[in-house]
């Protein structure tokens, strides 16, 4: 099997729900899972954690409009993010 190139050494996968957000931060081969609420101060806490960890890209999956407040905070804090749906 051919090995793929690493694009982001420090990245996050985020599953956004109405009242909860689950984040998997990956740094190299190490991962850390955290759960956050969806209030503004909780979104800011999550953003500070990701930025403090050196996160280079956050990819979030969301059904419905629940990703929008988080995306707006990421944009204000200059944390690169994308919305993806499988």
Regions found by a protein language model. Give the residues of each.
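Phosphate- and other anionic-substrate recognition elements at nucleic-acid/protein interfaces
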Residues: 1-86
């Amino acid at each position: 099997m051919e090995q793929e190139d690493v694009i982001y050494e420090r990245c996050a996968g985020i599953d956004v729900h109405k009242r909860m957000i689950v984040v998997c931060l990956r740094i190299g081969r190490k991962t850390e899972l955290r759960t956050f609420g969806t209030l503004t101060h909780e979104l800011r806490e999550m953003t500070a954690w990701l930025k403090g960890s050196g996160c280079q890209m956050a990819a979030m999956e969301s059904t419905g409009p629940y990703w929008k407040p988080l995306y707006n905070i990421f944009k204000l804090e200059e944390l690169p993010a994308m919305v993806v749906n499988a």
